[in-house]
């Protein structure tokens, strides 16, 4: 059985971007391949949870939308957890830094790149549904090829 580093699972309305105001269950994963100083997640403090426990907790909220966030959620086995949640009719969204390709099972991809802060890091995700910029002075022209 797969286990995942979970910082928290909670129900709230999405407060940012396209889905603002829409109820979601947030699954915040631990671990990240970047270390942004402004990050609001203590991604090094988490509890290992198995897939069945995560799904059970999500289903208890009776909400048909989940957003994977972190840390960097693309570091996890999203195919397994995504398949299990999809079997329950749940729409899957992700907020990612874009450095790891996202599996096709994800319905909505928000790319929030930080690669300009990390010269040795490049964007691997080539498609998305929205681009989220979180720091001033970011040169957005480098994302012109991102298919959004």
What is each stretch, according to the model?
Residues 19-21, 125:
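A generic structural micro-feature
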Residues 4-8, 23-24, 29, 35-106:
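Conserved Radical SAM active-site core
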Residues 74-148:
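Conserved AdoMet/S-adenosylmethionine-binding subsite of the radical SAM
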Residues 1-8, 12-15, 61-63, 139-148:
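Auxiliary Fe-S-binding modules of radical SAM enzymes
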Residues 32-33, 116:
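Short, solvent-exposed loop/turn segments at secondary-structure junctions
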Residues 7-10, 28, 110, 132-134:
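Residues in well-ordered beta-strands of folded domains
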């Amino acid at each position: 059985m797969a286990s995942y580093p979970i910082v928290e699972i909670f129900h709230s309305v999405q407060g940012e971007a396209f889905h603002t105001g829409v109820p979601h269950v947030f699954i915040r994963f631990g671990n990240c391949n970047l270390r942004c100083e402004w990050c609001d997640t203590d991604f090094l403090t988490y509890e290992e949870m198995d897939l069945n426990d995560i799904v059970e907790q999500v289903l208890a909220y009776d909400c048909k939308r989940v957003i994977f966030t972190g840390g960097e959620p693309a570091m996890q086995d999203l195919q397994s957890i995504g398949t299990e949640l999809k079997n329950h009719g749940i729409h899957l969204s992700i907020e990612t830094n874009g450095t790891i390709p996202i599996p096709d099972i994800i319905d909505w991809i928000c790319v929030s790149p930080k690669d300009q802060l990390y010269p040795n890091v490049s964007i691997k995700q080539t498609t998305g549904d929205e681009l989220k910029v979180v720091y001033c002075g970011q040169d957005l022209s480098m994302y012109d090829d991102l298919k959004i």
